[in-house]
Amino acid sequence: MERQRSFSVKSTRVLAFIITIISSAIVFFTFFSSSLLKSNSSLYPTPEANFQIDLSPIAAISDSSVSPQASPILISTHFNSPENTSGSSKISVFEQKISGESLVKEVREIANLTSIKVIELPSNNGEDKKTEKRIEECDVTKGKWVYDSDYPLYTNASCPFIDEGFGCQSNGRLDLNYMNWRWEPQDCHAPRFNATKMLEMIRGKRLVFVGDSINRNQWESMLCLLFQAVKDPKRVYETHNRRITKEKGNYSFRFVDYKCTVEFYVTHFLVREGRARIGKKRRETLRIDAMDRTSSRWKGANILVFNTAHWWSHYKTKSGVNYYQEGDLIHPKLDVSTAFKKALQTWSSWVDKNVDPKKTRVFFRSAAPSHFSGGEWNSGGHCREANMPLNQTFKPSYSSKKSIVEDVLKQMRTPVTLLNVSGLSQYRIDAHPSIYGTKPENRRSRAVQDCSHWCLPGVPDTWNHFLYLHLLHKR
């Protein structure tokens, strides 16, 4: 009896002990789970609490009006027609994707612009996809014009070198949005033009522009860009005390503090214009086998920027009748493309003979387009109505000449960099002087419109930006 009683007491105690352990485990597990959930919520906060996107620059865009000040419009970016035209500008759905390289937020509805789908934010190390491609490996000619309120880099008031023909604002142009467009390459982030760095790169050197009035357009742009970094304006002067006009063609501006000169020499064709006797009369001819008479002044330059194209579309050069001369021979008739190639071969021979590639960088700028509508420059052609860039390229005018230039450059011993500005300039019908190439008091009611040159500040600033990038990354 005594053994059985002792055994039943022990069984009861064991059972009670087991129940106590189970109860304690349940309580502990409940407490631990609650703590774990709280901990996880602190480790992974909601996207709204940690990530913010500033949508203020993104505004609804309709077909009826576009305000560059309101939104950074990307020219040649096309938007699908909105399914909902209520005008709401809120974000309806976010999808968050997190990876080791980047954070991508997909916005499915922003201001009813249903084609804007992805916004890419920088990765954790501060580099994005565009910067992965080195600028020297990037084709900066592929891109689009974007409206940038930080532009222009100078104004008609801050630059004293803009002649009347290019000073559109000074001549009364009121729509000034043409100044605010910046070219943005699609595959890389190009550093902005830095006037101080550019001056340091040409310290003690000669930067020489050679060509027609379109190259003078670019040269004046370069003077204006560089002048913004000069502390004392009196330390910049023209070495022959010449004032920039359309009449006088040769200039040399010295930047005293940098011991450099920025020069321009006018030549419409790079080869020699002259006169020869044809029958009983002396007529204008073009010596396609001889260099321009100013070529001796180009020697010794450290950076040479050439161009020719615009005057090759003139009626004299296009007709080619008793105009092109080689030696004593005046061609009764010569095709303009053949003459253009012969002239470039004369130029290329001069470069190969007179330029030392170890001391001089040579550039050739491609043709810049004209945008005449309704006629040519002397037959009622106009571009006054344009106040925005085109959303598609204008019909190319110099495609055949571009291929000739490329072929000639390939045959040269001296390395020559082609500054290809034709494509990006095609969009900018809005950036020509039009009727604003003269002062209002000198303007006739039926004045010829200038749809070939460019307002300053304007498109030539981008050409010089390309030149800057080549010098910066290929030193």
Swiss-Prot record:
Topology versus the membrane: Single-pass type II membrane protein
Transmembrane segments: 14-34
Keywords of this entry: Membrane, Signal-anchor, Transmembrane, Transmembrane helix
Compartments where found: Membrane
Chief location bin: membrane
Nucleotide-binding found in the keyword field: no
A molecular function (GO) term: O-acetyltransferase activity
Disulfide-linked positions: none
Motif window: GDS motif: 211-213
Gene Ontology annotations for the cellular component aspect, listed alphabetically: membrane
Entries under InterPro entries matching the protein: TBL (IPR029962), TBL_C (IPR026057), TBL_N (IPR025846)
Annotated motif DCXHWCLPGXXDXWN motif, positions: 450-464
Further remarks about this protein from its record: Contains 2 motifs that are conserved in esterases, but it is unlikely that this protein belongs to the catalytically active pectin esterases.
Family named by the database record: Belongs to the PC-esterase family. TBL subfamily.
PANTHER family: PROTEIN TRICHOME BIREFRINGENCE-LIKE 6, PROTEIN TRICHOME BIREFRINGENCE-LIKE 9-RELATED
Function: May act as a bridging protein that binds pectin and other cell wall polysaccharides. Probably involved in maintaining esterification of pectins. May be involved in the specific O-acetylation of cell wall polymers.
Protein name from the UniProt record: Protein trichome birefringence-like 6
Species annotation: Arabidopsis thaliana
